[in-house]
């Protein structure tokens, strides 16, 4: 009996048992928290999907009602409306040849059709019908009656004065934690668009966190290229590129911090323009990297032709925008510079020494150069403004998403997973890999952190400008990433954005003009593509662009800071010469 009591009451606890029990309890708690997080994320995503589906259904119903009550607007009229350039459309709206109602419903119907095929829209802005009813009060606006699509991260708030109902639409940037955080006000650009008579009518898809030039996220899914469903529409303004390239919008607003307007424009065969940072207001546009100042984002227009981009810039650069955002320099659009016919002194380079252009890119560039020379412009070959570049150091969001990989706080889109895996590795593993991968470093250009800091310094910008002045250049013609990549390859090929990212670093205005399409000969030549180094990234790039016959190919036009109108004028010259050729 004494032995029994000693066993029950006198036995000392075994610390191994206690520690094991504690560990099991902690593990169970972690699993429970992960499960709860999964459920919360899933519920948020489902709610967003239901909201989107309802908006699409209501838009479909409204279009059907309009068509039934307006039988005179037949398919021929709709086709005519959709074929007009922005300038022609605006003119016919102004003179009464077309009504805003007919134009709006024609584009809404086309948008719904394109979205079914490409999954490019995140939400129809149903309040656009209310704006349509009151549109005649803005008949003096430069964009009177024009439907405009906007990127998902651009703020849009709704106010119904009759019932005092005020609410905003989400600007998630494709990230679950930003769901159910509606905009508290219109972005400045949305306010100016409305003042100029434009009707924002749909929001378009983006990659998760705006951190890829693919276009997919766990909330709204993957967007497809309008010319080939196996290819990406680009990013991060990929929904805009797909919708405009598919004919569902005549004008869109995107944002660009590394090529996010220019890459989708190139991949989808449209024109896109990244203005000098702070030429257009960023107020009200959502971002996932707050406080980031080293590389500035720009909002800018995307459209089917360069004149549409210029008209949009002209409309936005007005007193109303400068009043709403007094931090901007009040520089109105210079129509005289845009319409100038003075011969240009054009710089040209075909290879930045880092990412060799594909055969179709190189051919398109050489053909454009020849056309410009034939038209009387002077083309010279200065050094490329960059011979090396490294990954974006702004890792706040990437690190946050890498935590999601470990802790399952929310799903990471396949478009981005490969890109963020290295950040989720333990520090010890990273150190081991850095030793093992040292030989690979010598295969490509030696990129040091000091070089990155140098690129960001003002000295570097002034050196490039000094070289530009020494060569007496007006503008620059250079390669544009393309043709469109196969889905999920962009995450593995962030190195190829050197051609676009450098002009964000330098804060130079830059735009994209489609000039050709991939030919069978280009595809044959691609079979022998080795790149600059013949390394793993060159091989990946070759795979990414394979199967691109018929896809659009673009060139990039660049000017010095604050010479946006000159850049657009150069883009129009390129567009005109290439159109005449074909």
What are these model-predicted stretches?
Residues 174, 483-500, 520-540:
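Short, surface-exposed loop/helix-turn segments at secondary-structure junctions
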Residues 2-9, 41-47, 109, 113, ...:
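Structural helix-boundary/capping segments
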Residues 81, 117, 364, 390-405:
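Soluble, non-transmembrane catalytic domains of enzymes that act on hydrophobic metabolites at membranes
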Residues 361, 391-399, 486-494:
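Short glycine/threonine-rich loop-to-helix capping motif typified by GTGT followed
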């Amino acid at each position: 009996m004494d032995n029994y009591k000693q066993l029950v009451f006198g036995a000392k606890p075994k610390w191994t048992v206690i520690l094991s029990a504690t560990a099991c309890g902690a593990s169970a708690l972690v699993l429970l928290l992960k499960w709860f997080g999964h459920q919360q994320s899933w519920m948020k995503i489902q709610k967003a999907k239901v909201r989107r589906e309802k908006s699409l259904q209501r838009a479909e119903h409204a279009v059907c009602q309009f068509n039934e009550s307006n039988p005179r607007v037949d398919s021929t009229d709709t086709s005519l409306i959709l074929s007009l350039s922005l300038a022609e459309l605006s003119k016919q709206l102004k003179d009464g040849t077309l009504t805003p109602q007919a134009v709006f419903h024609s584009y809404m119907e086309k948008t719904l059709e394109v979205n079914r095929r490409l999954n490019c829209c995140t939400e129809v802005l149903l309040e656009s019908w209310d704006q349509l009813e009151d549109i005649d009060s803005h008949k003096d606006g430069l964009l009177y009656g024009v439907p405009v699509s906007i990127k998902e991260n651009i703020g849009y708030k709704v106010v119904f004065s009759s019932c005092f109902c005020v609410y905003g639409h989400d600007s998630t940037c494709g990230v679950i934690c930003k769901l159910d955080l509606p905009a508290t006000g219109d972005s400045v650009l949305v306010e100016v668009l409305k003042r100029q008579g434009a009707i924002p009518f749909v929001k378009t898809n983006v990659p998760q966190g705006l951190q890829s030039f693919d276009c997919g996220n766990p909330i709204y899914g993957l967007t497809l290229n309008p010319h080939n469903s196996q290819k990406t529409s680009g990013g991060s303004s990929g929904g805009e590129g797909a919708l405009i390239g598919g004919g569902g919008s005549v004008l869109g607003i995107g944002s660009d911090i590394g090529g996010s307007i220019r890459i989708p424009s190139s991949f989808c065969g449209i024109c896109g323009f990244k203005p000098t940072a702070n030429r257009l207001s960023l107020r009200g546009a959502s971002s996932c990297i707050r406080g980031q100042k080293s590389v500035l984002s720009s909002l800018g227009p995307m459209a089917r032709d360069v004149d549409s981009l210029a008209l949009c810039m002209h409309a936005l650069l007005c007193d109303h925008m400068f009043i709403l955002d007094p931090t901007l320099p009040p520089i109105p659009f210079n129509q005289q510079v845009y319409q100038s016919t003075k011969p240009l002194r054009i710089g040209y380079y075909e290879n930045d020494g880092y990412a060799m252009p594909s055969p179709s890119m190189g051919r398109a560039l050489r053909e454009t150069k020849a056309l410009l020379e034939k038209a009387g412009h002077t083309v010279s070959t200065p050094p490329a403004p960059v011979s090396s570049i490294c990954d974006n150091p702004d890792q706040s969001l990437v690190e946050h998403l890498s935590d999601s990989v470990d802790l399952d706080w929310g799903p990471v889109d396949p478009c981005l997973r490969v890109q963020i895996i290295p950040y989720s590795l333990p520090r010890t593993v990273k150190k081991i890999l850095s030793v093992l991968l040292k030989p690979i470093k010598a295969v490509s250009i030696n990129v040091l952190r000091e070089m990155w800091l140098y690129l960001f310094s003002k000295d570097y910008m002034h050196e490039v400008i000094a070289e530009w002045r020494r060569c007496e250049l007006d503008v620059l013609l250079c390669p544009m990433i393309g043709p469109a990549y196969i889905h999920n390859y962009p995450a593995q090929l962030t190195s190829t954005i050197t051609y676009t990212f450098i002009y964000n670093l330098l804060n130079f205005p830059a735009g994209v003009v489609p000039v050709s399409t991939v030919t069978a000969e280009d595809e044959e030549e691609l079979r022998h593509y080795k790149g600059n180094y013949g390394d793993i990234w060159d091989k990946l790039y070759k795979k990414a662009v394979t199967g691109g016959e018929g896809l659009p190919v673009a060139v990039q036009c660049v000017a010095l800071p604050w010479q946006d109108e000159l850049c657009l004028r150069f883009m129009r010259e390129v567009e005109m010469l290439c159109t005449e050729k074909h």
